[in-house]
Structure formats: structure tokens, C-alpha cells
Amino acid sequence: MKTIVKMIAAATVMGCAVSCGTPRGDEVPSDFKYLIDEFADLKIMRYRVPGWNALSLRQKEYVYHLSEAAKYGRDILWDQNCAVNLPVRHVLEDIIEKYDGDRECQEYADFLVYAKRVFFSNGIHHHYAEEKFFPDCSREYFAGLMAAVGDENAELLEAIYSPTLYRWRKTDVGDIVKGSSVNFYEGVDRKEVDDFYAAMADPNDREPVSYGLNSKLVKGDDGVIREEVYRIDGLYGAAISKIVGELELASEAAESELQKQYVKTLIDYYRSGDLRLWDKYNIEWVKDTLGTVDFINGFIEDYNDPLGRKATWEGLVNVRDEEASQRTVKLSENAQWFEDHSPVDPRFRKPVVKGISAKVIDAVTLAGDCYPATPIGINLPNADWIRREHGSKSVTIANITHAYDFAAQESPKSTLAEFAWDDDEIAMAKKYLSLTDEIHTDLHECLGHGSGQLLPGTSPNALGEFNSTLEETRADLFGLYYMADPKLVELGILPDGEAYKAMYANYIRNGLLVQFSRVELGKKNTEAHMQNRKLIAQWCYDKGLADNVIEKKVRDGKTYFVVNDYPALRELFGKLLAEIQRVKSEGDYATGKALVEKYAVNIDYNLHKEVLERYASLNLKPYGGFVNPRIEPVERNGKVVDYAISYTDGYLEQMLEYGHKYRTL
């Protein structure tokens, strides 16, 4: 599970104030720029790796090969997102590199923005809104560009410009399998998919594999439905063989025997596609709590599958931030206390919390579904039975959070000044929000996703297409409920009993207002994390109306949502958490569906229009992503003596380089 992006209010309010200071152990040049490009609704940033020079040569070698393995998975994600994505990308790369016509005209500028957007989204659909976006240059001009570089292709041009073809990457309307453009299914409808996997599942299996996680489901010409498994001699084999090659080199530089063992298990899994080996790898991986270097690499998250079953490929290589990790260690050491005092029905609590570990990390390489838009927190593994029996690992990605904050300082305006009600609310955010935002991420990932249990016989897929939204809702609510608990002050995690109010005010402000700047006017709220925030904020607003817990105010034609009663809001968070946990534990699909459809999806048109107009006046970009640092071996007399890190790559430069160097499909 991921906290996908830094929450928009926290990501942009820090243009007013930031409390995080200079990244640890990193001499940042005075002319260093975190923000390096802006276009459409996107901003591109750099992040730094402050602990790089403290790593040993062996650790750097381990990181280098893990990073190469991660980058070689890039083409897999592009193809998973939509079957035409790779052909489109190859044409865009050809035009940018080979076109010798006029590059100063407006239509070429429009083409270039489109290309950058496709690179950012790993395809032709918006990375958050799921809908296909289009070039602003004319179809005729685009066709001319293709012809100029020898890439004439009428079918591909139609795929780019048709308003109906490949309209949605993932849809929630009609037959959500046939109506989605993701490349997980071919020739099958939803019922056929459900029936296929229902026949596989054993409801009495207490340790089930994640059926369908690493495969494409295809109906052949003979009418037989089969899985095409992602493995070295199967689907995506060319990319997987490159990943395996780098993992083999990485294992030779691993920090410990345990790391060598689970890297070997991961390689065995990639060779066979056997999901039992994937589970074995996760069990071994979750035991590694002492290493400085860590990584994820594989088919992990199912957010992009309309049925919440099949996983996209992703990679992340990271190093531990020892000092900041002390905060998360306190949380994990007290996980049983938090579980025991949760406001949910005791039947749905874990009687014994096992193996929860947490740390703060610095990303070194982002890849696949973590690149260029990246999560700021991760909790894995996802299998409920592994979490129950073996525990989980949670991370908060500090240098990504800090990069967001420092990039925001480079902008003169902020959402906080525009959407907060008064100076007191602004002052509270400036004092506490940078800290409370990080702590909420810790609570969400470390404890929220790891909390609770399914009742015996409840399928982990029981909530179907609503599972991702409801799971993120559950984890957010767990964090929100405990933000106000005196236990956090007692543990020294929060400075005082007032700090949580900054998080509460920000969450409501974002969930009911600011986040809609990311949605095109008149469209529905479709992304799981945005849905979860709206569900929570809207439910609490509605349920607290009689007591004026959250008040809608209008001043000078502008709308604000103000928290009047913070303790009462905490009670509402607790009540909703109890209900969401019940829904998950019992697999109550009907209630989960009703909650999402009533509170999470629809946006009031007039309010939406107002938010977009106010946000536009700030000249800010609602979405952010990153370029990776460059890591290169340093040789002396034919021997590698170091691995140097640099932060010089531009956005297009890196995208084009990756398109050549790591092209496998």
C-alpha cells in the first residue's frame, strides 16, 4: 500500500513556511534548484540523497545494481498501462531527437508539452484522472511530424487523437474490464474474469496466493481463457531477464546473508512466475529490519486494475535515515497498544500484532509505477495473511517530502494563504503542519495498513473495485484518529496537545476543497487516494452538521471549511474507522460501494469551478514528479573505486536516455 503523493495542501502550503530545514548531511549548493520544469498541470523536481557519502563502496555497489534492475522494468509498466503506450512513446522519442523542421513555432511547443505529459504518465492517460489527454497541436501537424521522421502510422495517430478509442485507462462505468484500456485483460469481460479466479480460490486456504497478481488474462481464438504469466520465459521476459541480470550482480554486494537469500528468492520467482515464491520472498524481505540499503522490485500494487487484482510493476531503491527513523521505531514498538485501543470492534482487531517495523528512508532511485510521480510512504507486503503472521515494513520517504517542501519555497504563492480561513489557521499550519504531515504518513503506513484483521472466510478481494479506496480510507482514518491521542505526546512524537489540530484543519480543507484543483471541471473524483480523502471529509461534514463540527463559511464570494470542534471531529473519525474496518473485515461489498458512491465520487459543480479559478490565480501546478539522481561508477586502473552521484539531469534528457538505455520491449 502507498501514500501515493504528498497531500496537496501539505505539498504546496510550505511555500509559506517549512520546518524541515536542510537535508541531513548534505551540502546543498546555494544555486541548487529543486524545481526544474513546469508544464500543463505538472511540475518536475529533483531530490537529493543526503547519506550517499556515508555509504561504503560495497553498499554503493549494491545500490547501483539494484537501481539498474529497477530501471530495466520501465517498459513493463508502459505496456501494462495501455497496449499502444510503447509505440506512442517511440514515435515521440523519434520526433524529439530527429525532427529537423521548425522547433520554434507554437504547434511544436504544443507537441512538446504533450510528449512531456506522456512521459510523465507512463502513457497516454492522465496518471491520476485516468482519462486520455490530447495534444494541443493539430492532427495534421502531428501527422507531418511523424512523416518527417519516417514514422507514418495512421492507426497510431487515431489512437492518439480519437476521443473514443482508449478513452479511459480505468473506468468505473459499465463493464469495467471491457471499458478500461489497461493491458491486463484481452477478450474477456468482468464476469469471465470473476468466474476464472473464483474457480481458483479456496475459501478455506488461510495462506492464499494473490491469484492473478502477475499475469495477463487472455481469451484465445479457441475460446479458452488462459493466464499469460510475467516471467523470464513468458510475458515481459526480455525486460525481466535484464532485471534478473542486475539482481544477480546486486546479490554479490549485499550487506547480509539475509539480503542475499531474498534477492535469490526474488530471482527464482522472476524465473518461474510462481506466486508461492513471491510470498516466500516477501516473508524473507519483511524480516530484514537492520540493513541500511533496501528496495522493492516487482508486480506489487493493484490500483490500476479496475478489479483490484493485477499489479503494475514498480521499483524503489533506498537507504535508511537513522536519525529520523527513531520516530517510527517508537510507533512500531507500541503497535500493540495502538491496536488494543483502536475504536473498532474487538473482533476485528489483531489479538497479537506481529513483526511491524518502520523506518524513514531516502530514495535513491524511483522506477516503474514510482516514477516520475512517487509515493511518500509505503507499507508492504500487501497479502493480509503475511501481514497477520509475519508482519510488515513501513517507510516514510523523507527526501521526497523535503524536495516537495523546498520546491514549494521557490514559489511566491501558496494554497494555504488562499484556502485557510484566517491568520490563526495559517499560523497553526506554519508551526506544526510539516511535522504533523510526516507523522500522519508514519501512522498511515506503519500502523494503519497493518491494523485489523479479516474474519475467517473473508476473501481479501471481497470489496472488488472499491478495495483500494476503502483500504486507503481505513489507513488514513487510523492515522487521523491517533493524531489527537495523548500517547503521541507521551512518546515524544508530537510536541504538544495542540499540534494535531493543524493536521485536522488541513485534512478537511484539502478533502473538501483544495484537492479538486486536480480534477477537470465537471469530471468525477476517480483516483483512490483522492476518493478516500473526500469520503472521510464529506462523511464527517455531513455527520457533524447538527453540531456544527465543521462549518462551511463564505467570505467575499470564496468558500471555506472551518473546524469548530476538534475533539468532536476526532470522535467522527473514530466512528467512521470502526465502520470501514467492519466493512473490510466482513467483506461487506454493498456497504463499501454505497459509502464510496455517496461520499467519494461526485463534486459539486459550482464549488469545483470556484476551486479551479482560485487555484489558477496562484500559478501553481497540482501534480509533481521527479528526475532521479545519476549514479555512475568511478574507475581507476580498470577497477571501480567509487560510485559518484550527481543531480544534473534535466527532465527530457533523462526521459530520452531511459528510453534508449533501458528499452527492452
PLM-predicted stretches and their roles:
Residues 113-219, 227-425, 433:
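Contiguous, non-catalytic segments that form substrate-binding/exosite surfaces or channel walls
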Residues 446-458, 482, 486:
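Catalytic Zn2+-binding segment of zinc metalloproteases
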Residues 452-473:
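Post-HEXXH active-site segment of zinc metalloproteases
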